[in-house]
């Protein structure tokens, strides 16, 4: 599966497959490596300052554990959540990666890049958020 339509930050929602009762709460103080997050190192329940989202409902539904949630970039930014777009992620993931996507293995960076392309992935960055539990409740609604 690949993303087909041009996603527009100003009008299109971002979707997240998650639990039925609530969106997982990120940990702003956790390791902020983007490759570590996307590659899902350390498995379920790992601490991460990011929440993965997708441009398409159907793609997010693949990761659903009961519900697909949605938000808008404007809502997230209003609550001090930073948005890292798919385009930005792809630009960071070349060679051994750049910035927060820098990683010792160029192969793992390349694999993370493939996942971003495949799932139309965007990241919501909670590193500057004081109370991520409340913030996730404010910015996400069931779609």
Residue ranges with predicted function:
Residues 1-143:
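NAD-dependent ADP-ribosyltransferases
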